[in-house]
Amino acid sequence: MEASCILPVLKKKLAFLSGGKDRRSGLILTIPLCTEQTSMEELSTTLDYLLGIPSEKCKARGFTVIVDGRKSQWNIVKTVVLMLQNVIPAEVSLVCVVKPDEFWDKKVTHFCFWKEKDRLGFEVILVSANKLTRYIEPCQLTDEFGGSLLYDHLDWVNKRLVFEKFTKESTSLLDELIVINENEKGSQAEKDRSSESNILPSFDPETVLQTGHELLSELQQRRFNGSEGGGGGGTAWSPMDDELLAQPQVMKLLDSLREQYTKYQEVCRQRSKRSQLEEIQTKVMQVVNWLEGPGTDQLRTQWGIGDSIRASQALQQKHEEIESQHSEWFAVYVELNQQIAALLSAGDEEDLMELKGLQQQLSDVCYRQASQLEFRQNVLQSAYEFHMTAQDLSQQLDGLLGMLCADVAPADGAAIQQTLKHLEEKLKSVESALQTLREKGQALLDQMSNQTSFSYGKEVGVENKENIDHIHSVMEDMQLRKQRCEDMVDVRRLKMLQMVQLFKCEEDASQAVEWLGELLDALLKTHIRLGDDSQETKVLLEKHKKFVDVAQSTYDYGRQLLQATVVLCQSLRCTTRSSGDTLPRLNRVWKQFTVTSDERQHRLEMASAFHTAAEKIVRESPELAELLVDVEAYEEVETLGKGLLDRLTVPVIFPDGSEQFFGSPGDMASSAESIRERMKLVEEKRFLQEEAEQRLEEEEEEEEAALEVEPRES
């Protein structure tokens, strides 16, 4: 019978074992009768339960039953005493009926007990509460009988529930653990590792053990406290004493439970290891089967490199999706590898070879698949870079071709040089891009030539041949386009150089006009002196001749340049640019220079004739001092001088009717003054000569007169 089944009855406290003992060490059973009608059935149930608690040894020492009739009627007390005969006649050694203060009819009570004495089998005495100490020590009596023994009925009931629950659960758990451990031993011997043998206990062993330890600890603590207070009149024996709750039984259950639980833990460890190993095997095969199955099939179908950037990007996106699916399985591989490494570090020899085999198989498949993914990714990246370079080169070639096809009309040579520089830079960039395309194409071809077939069978020669042909086709097409552009660049370069020459000729022709104009300006403004004597004039004539030669060379150079522009324009098929104002300006300036030069030449020649004539008259040599000059010479000098002076006042008249003087008025006055001084000297010479001639005539006349006188005198 369990306390939980009769819990409401037990809580009524119809009877209880307080833990106290009589002088014979027999247990004291107390039946506290109350004023209310007591149910004999419930009392009998309570007594049956209580008498099942003590051990047989305790029962052999007999019970002392205290029937508290102070609050009850005699007939109820009598019924209870008679009932004891039917419930525990052999175990009862003494029944103490505690009488109330108002004593029952002595004759009746004595007669009844005496009458039933032989039939009852135990002694029944009537005693007042204060006389119980004659039979039982005060420390073994509870406080309602004047004793010092502490008893809490509800606490006792709760502890009984705990004890019985522990006993029930531990016994059941112990049986289950024994069965599980034995079954596990048999399954290991038969190598039977089916999941059906993985039986779990009905109760949590840790919880049951914890409950048992707490219960045992409390029992031991109660016994310790009770033994301390038992001899000093304090707290006496507790109802949770080992004789009532069988502390050794708890200890024995705990020991057995710990032993079987230790074995069960090993069983669980073996189960966990087997389960983990089986789970690892399952996951390994899942990874291997997927990688060698769907994963390999996905890679087998992806061998193209695309024919454009967009196609290559689409293939890369598809490959990323494949990689994403593989990544999930690679993550499982990493987790499995860690689990296998942990199991290997545990050092279980039994599964060591199997684990290593699984690890090796998993690693081989994963690394092989990862290398295929990486190879495919590298090929796609190289293909993308190849197509990117090809597109960039194609755009550069298109731009260069458009630039070459455009009809440009540069404004000057600097613009042409800039255009040529831009063309050269474009061509150089195209050459660099083509070289990069060749390098990337060759790298891609090398990658594809090193490509191997999958270990599960499919050669990839057909797919590779298409890819290789496409790469060669792209590179050859780009090479041809580049060659065509180079040819057109050569033609454009030649045309540009001719245009540079044209602009240069026009520029130099304009420069020749400017130089000729500068020479004319210099001739008019600086070539003014006519010389102070014939020698200086002769030098000026030589310089003038050279100056005219320079001007003639400049004019001829300008004419040649303008003729070259005509030829270049014919070659370039453009209108003759030199038919503008350059040639008229050149001719106009040259005519002006010719007129001016002739005038300068004429003036220098007149000055030379003047100085020569004057120098014949004016001689500084002493031998020629008395040399007489003809009158015609003087007249010639005077005529030349006046003509030269008149010439200085005459401007240079250009073909267009414009006029220009040599130098400034001051320059002309200076030149005229020099001529006049020379003429003055000649005039003085003439005067002196005339005086000399007059004196000579006078002397001759005097001589003639003298000669005429002498004959007369003689």
Curated annotation (Swiss-Prot):
GO molecular function annotation: phosphatidylinositol-3,4-bisphosphate binding; phosphatidylinositol-3,5-bisphosphate binding; phosphatidylinositol-3-phosphate binding; phosphatidylinositol-4,5-bisphosphate binding; phosphatidylinositol-4-phosphate binding; phosphatidylinositol-5-phosphate binding
Presence of keyword Mitochondrion: no
Keyword Repeat tagged: yes
InterPro entries attached to this UniProt entry: CRAL-TRIO_dom (IPR001251), Spectrin/alpha-actinin (IPR018159), Spectrin_SESTD1 (IPR056804)
Spectrin repeat extents: 275-381, 384-497, 503-605
Example GO BP: blood vessel morphogenesis
Keyword list, A-Z: Repeat
One Pfam family cited in the UniProt record for this chain: CRAL_TRIO_2
Segments crossing the lipid bilayer: none
Domain named CRAL-TRIO: residues: 1-153
Biased composition (Acidic residues): 696-707
Region (Disordered) location: 691-714
Function: May act as the primary docking protein directing membrane turnover and assembly of the transient receptor potential channels trpc4 and trpc5. Binds phospholipids.
Family: Belongs to the SOLO family.
Protein name, UniProt field: SEC14 domain and spectrin repeat-containing protein 1
The encoding gene: sestd1
